[in-house]
C-alpha cells in the first residue's frame, strides 16, 4: 500500500489476545500514524515486510514512515519491527510517543532465514514507564516459526541473513524497566547489528 494515514484512532484488544497486534504496517510506503492510542495483547505499532524467501520475491520494503504523538497503554511491545521483515524496513521516524506498562518498549526482532535489512531508523523523545522487560531490545534470536519444517538455512547463504544498522535513539526516558538495552546479533556474526546509538552512546 501507499499513502496510508492513521489519525486519532483508538485500538483496544484484550490483554490475553494471542497475536492481538494493534496495527501491522506491512510493505507500505509513505505512512503517517499520529495522535492514536493502543491497548493491545501483543505488539502495538509494528512494521513488517513479509517472511523468508517468498517475501523477497513478491513483497516490497516498508519505508518512509512517520509516527508521532501516540500512546501505548499496555501490550507486548510499544514500537516493533519484525519479525517478518524479509524485504526490509527503512527510513522510519518515531517521536513524541509514550509507552506505559508494556512488556518491552522498543523491539526489533528477526532470525536466521528472514534476510532483509532494517536501516535508517530514528526514535526521539520517547517516554516509557513501568516496562516489564527491556526498554530497548534488538534481537536476531526470534526463532518462533522462522523456518519451515522442511527448510534448512545455512549461514553462508547471505540472502537469509538479516541486518539491523544505522539506528538512532535520542532522548529515550525510562521510568522503571528490568533492563535498559539488550542487543543479540546472530551468533558469530556481530556485524548483523551495527551503528546503533542510544542517548548518545554507541552500542554497536
What are these regions (language model features)?
Residues 1-204:
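Extracellular/periplasmic carbohydrate-active domains that bind, remodel
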Amino acid at each position: 500500500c501507499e499513502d496510508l494515514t492513521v489519525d486519532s484512532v483508538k485500538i483496544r484488544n484484550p490483554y490475553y489476545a494471542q497475536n492481538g497486534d494493534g496495527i501491522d504496517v506491512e510493505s507500505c510506503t509513505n505512512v503517517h500514524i499520529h495522535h492514536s492510542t493502543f491497548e493491545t495483547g501483543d505488539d502495538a505499532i509494528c512494521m513488517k515486510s513479509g517472511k523468508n524467501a517468498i517475501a523477497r520475491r513478491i513483497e516490497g520494503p516498508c519505508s518512509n514512515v512517520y509516527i508521532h504523538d501516540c500512546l501505548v497503554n499496555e501490550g507486548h511491545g510499544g514500537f516493533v519491527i519484525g519479525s517478518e521483515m524479509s524485504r526490509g524496513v527503512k527510513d522510519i521516524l518515531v517521536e513524541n510517543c509514550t509507552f506505559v506498562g508494556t512488556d518491552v518498549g522498543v523491539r526489533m526482532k528477526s532470525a536466521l532465514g528472514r534476510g532483509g535489512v532494517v536501516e535508517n531508523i530514528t526514535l526521539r523523545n520517547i517516554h516509557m514507564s513501568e516496562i516489564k522487560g527491556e526498554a530497548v531490545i534488538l534481537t536476531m534470536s526470534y526463532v518462533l516459526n522462522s523456518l519451515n519444517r522442511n527448510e534448512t538455512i545455512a549461514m553462508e547463504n547471505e540472502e537469509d541473513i538479516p541486518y539491523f544498522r544505522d539506528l538512532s535513539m535520542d532522548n529515550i526516558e525510562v521510568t522503571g524497566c528490568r533492563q535498559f538495552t539488550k542487543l543479540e546479533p546472530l551468533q558469530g556474526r556481530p556485524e548483523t547489528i551495527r551503528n546503533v546509538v542510544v542517548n548518545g552512546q554507541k552500542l554497536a
